[in-house]
C-alpha cells in the first residue's frame, strides 16, 4: 500500500481524539487530563491536536456530547419499537450492560464534576452544552417511556444510582447490586 493511503483523514483523526479523550477524561477528569496525554494516546503531536480542536475545552465538549449520544444509542437500540414499561425494562437492562464499560459511565460523572467546577469559575460554556445534551437525552427517554416526566425522572435516577455505585467501585457481584434485578433468566450458580 502507498503510504498516503494508510493515512487517516482529519475527520478520522478527530474521531480518534474524541474516543481517546473520553477514556482520559473518564479516568482523570477535566482538570487532571492534559492535552498532551490525549495526543499521546492518539499518536499525534499536540500542535496537530490543536488543528483538529481549538483547545482542551472543545475536546472535552466533543467527548461529553459523544458520551451522551452513545448513551442514547444504547437506549434506542435496546428499546426500538417498544414504549412504556417494556421500553424502560429494555433500556435498564442495556444500561446495566454499561457497568462493564466504566469509561462510559465515568465520563458521565466527570462531566457533572466539570460543569460544577466551570460554574464555580464563572465559565459556564461546558455547563450550557452539558445541560442541553442532558435535557435532550431526558426528553428522548421521556418520549420513549410514554411521555411521563415522572417515569423519565425515575428512570434517570436509576441510572444515576448505577453511575454512583460504579464510581464508588462496588464490584458487580456485591450485594448492593441485588436490588437491580436479574440480568438473565438463568438461576444463580450454587
Q: What do these predicted regions represent?
A:
Residues 95, 108-112, 155-159:
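Short alpha-helical scaffolding segments that buttress acidic/His motifs in well-ordered protein cores
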Residues 1-4:
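Short, intrinsically disordered or compositionally biased N-terminal tails of bacterial proteins
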Residues 87-88, 100-121:
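Amphipathic alpha-helical segments used for helix-helix packing
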Residues 119-190:
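Hydrophobic/aromatic-rich alpha-helical bundle segments in the mid-to-C-terminal region
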Amino acid at each position: 500500500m502507498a503510504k498516503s493511503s494508510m493515512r487517516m483523514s482529519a475527520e478520522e483523526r478527530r474521531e480518534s481524539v474524541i474516543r481517546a479523550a473520553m477514556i482520559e477524561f473518564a479516568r482523570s477528569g477535566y482538570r487532571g487530563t492534559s492535552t498532551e496525554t490525549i495526543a499521546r494516546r492518539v499518536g499525534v503531536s499536540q500542535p496537530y491536536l490543536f488543528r483538529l480542536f481549538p483547545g482542551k475545552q472543545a475536546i472535552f465538549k466533543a467527548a461529553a456530547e459523544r458520551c451522551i449520544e452513545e448513551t442514547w444509542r444504547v437506549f434506542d437500540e435496546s428499546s426500538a419499537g417498544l414504549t412504556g414499561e417494556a421500553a424502560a425494562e429494555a433500556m435498564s437492562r442495556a444500561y446495566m450492560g454499561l457497568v462493564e464499560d466504566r469509561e462510559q459511565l465515568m465520563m458521565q460523572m466527570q462531566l457533572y464534576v466539570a460543569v460544577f467546577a466551570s460554574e464555580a469559575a464563572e465559565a459556564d460554556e461546558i455547563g450550557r452544552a452539558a445541560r442541553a445534551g442532558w435535557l435532550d437525552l431526558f426528553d428522548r427517554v421521556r418520549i420513549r417511556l410514554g411521555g411521563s416526566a415522572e417515569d423519565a425522572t425515575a428512570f434517570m435516577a436509576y441510572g444515576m444510582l448505577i453511575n454512583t455505585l460504579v464510581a464508588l467501585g462496588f464490584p458487580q457481584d456485591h450485594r448492593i447490586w441485588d436490588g437491580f434485578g436479574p440480568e438473565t433468566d438463568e438461576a444463580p450458580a450454587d
